[in-house]
């Protein structure tokens, strides 16, 4: 990550070597926006995405532009505002259930807890309330292994690497089989009762509805989209929240201001989407954490035709990349870029111009389809945690960013201190 940060402030376009591939790195947000506005020319492809498709198939995150154009309108109904309104209470319930287990003045493994939380939220919003705890436990155990295995195979110099009978490969293949089995089992169960079941508010119901009509998702495509949501939806939000809670523990003045805004606005009530839109400082805290530690730290494209970015000509078949992490640490875009400053995003300082270099979920027509869902679940969780607990740094060193598929902290340990309940004035944590 220090290498990416060192590129901040350089010329608009650089040529570097990424492993065996020579790539253009875009360092200027205006050129990044141009690239994202031309998804047919700057398509998902090249060595990494070609490998990814062989591993995780052809979901929205990896599909070529022509296929993405067909799939996205069919998947979009799973992420409507009405469905988000229905998901919010589930997000709050799962967060409360998790933080009920925290103990006063005891260390909390934040990374492990956030993975657990967002695995449960994703499982319930994806599959509905019928998903049993054993299946959720399988998802929690299998997903980190699969994510690690996918990254290892995508970056392996030789295709045969994944065929070697190593312990890591055997563990990956077992975890992937478990994950696919859970997905298939629940699709089969839901299809079997769909005619006798009221319209579901879960994502899988929306995807199964997308199998109706002339242009529809096939059964294999429904499976691929669910696999993609699980791969992308849990780790990214868990990492974003882990970094956010780490920063809050290290900045008590920010944490107290956040708590005051939440208490004044909600008084302990579960927030609606409208409530969340009014929590300006709370949203600023999360946005600033994702500026410093964007869940997606590197995005790559492959040119499908001869083209240009600004004054630079780029031949067809070229690898083109940009790093949200690099742009987010560019002092030309964000003065004093290493400072954790949520007020960057709040009135009177926050405006559209300040967001032109912000890319935590990519951008353009291929921006993450679940960005609003991810922000909503993170905000709901942040509200619930900040209402009931105050965090201070735990023992050990500060976390170190680890760049894999996402930008993960190697560890975050915080000590939890109960806060008085806004409703009754009593401590809300277990003692």
Question: Which ranges hold each PLM region?
Answer:
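Conserved cytochrome P450 K-helix E-x-x-R motif and the immediately C-terminal K′/meander segment
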Residues: 1-11, 181, 269-310, 331
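Conserved cytochrome P450 catalytic core segment spanning the I/J/K helices
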Residues: 2, 12, 53, 80, ...
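Cytochrome P450 catalytic-core helices
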Residues: 236-261, 371-389
């Amino acid at each position: 990550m220090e290498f990416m940060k060192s590129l901040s402030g350089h010329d608009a376009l650089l040529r570097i070597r990424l492993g065996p591939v020579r790539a253009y790195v875009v360092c200027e947000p205006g050129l990044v926006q141009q690239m994202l506005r031309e998804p047919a020319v700057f398509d998902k492809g090249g060595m990494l995405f070609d490998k990814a498709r062989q591993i995780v198939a052809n979901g929205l995150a990896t599909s070529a532009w022509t296929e993405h154009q067909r799939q996205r309108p069919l998947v979009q109904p799973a992420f409507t505002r009405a469905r988000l309104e229905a998901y919010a209470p589930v997000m709050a319930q799962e967060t409360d259930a998790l933080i009920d287990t925290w103990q006063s003045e005891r260390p909390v493994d934040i990374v492990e807890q956030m993975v657990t939380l967002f695995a449960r939220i994703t499982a319930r919003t994806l599959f509905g309330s019928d998903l049993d705890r054993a299946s959720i436990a399988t998802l929690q155990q299998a997903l980190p292994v699969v994510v690690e295995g996918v990254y290892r195979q995508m970056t392996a110099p030789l295709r045969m690497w994944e065929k070697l009978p190593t312990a890591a490969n055997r563990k990956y293949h077992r975890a992937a089989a478990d994950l696919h089995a859970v997905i298939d089992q629940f699709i089969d169960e839901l299809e079997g009762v769909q005619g006798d079941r009221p319209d579901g508010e879960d994502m899988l119901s929306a995807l199964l509805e997308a199998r109706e009509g002339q242009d529809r998702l096939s059964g294999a495509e429904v499976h691929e989209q669910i696999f993609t949501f699980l791969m992308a939806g849990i780790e990214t939000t868990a990492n974003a929240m882990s970094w956010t809670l780490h920063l809050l523990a290290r900045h008590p003045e920010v944490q107290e201001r956040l708590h005051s805004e939440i208490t004044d606005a909600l008084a302990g009530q579960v927030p609606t989407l409208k409530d969340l839109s009014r929590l300006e400082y709370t949203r600023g805290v999360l946005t600033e954490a994702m500026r410093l530690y964007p869940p997606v730290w590197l995005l790559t494209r492959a040119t499908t035709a001869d083209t240009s970015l600004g004054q630079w000509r780029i031949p067809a078949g070229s690898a083109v990349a940009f790093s949200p992490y690099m742009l987010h640490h560019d002092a030309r875009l964000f003065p004093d870029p290493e400072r954790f400053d949520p007020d960057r995003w709040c009135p009177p300082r926050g405006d559209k111009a300040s967001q032109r270099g912000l890319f935590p979920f990519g951008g353009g027509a291929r921006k993450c389809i679940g960005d609003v869902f991810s922000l909503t679940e993170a905000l709901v969780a942040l509200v619930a945690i900040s209402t009931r607990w105050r965090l201070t740094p735990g023992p050990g060193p500060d976390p170190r960013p680890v760049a894999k598929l996402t930008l993960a902290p190697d560890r975050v340990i915080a000590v939890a201190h109960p806060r008085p309940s806004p409703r009754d004035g009593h401590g809300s944590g277990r003692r």
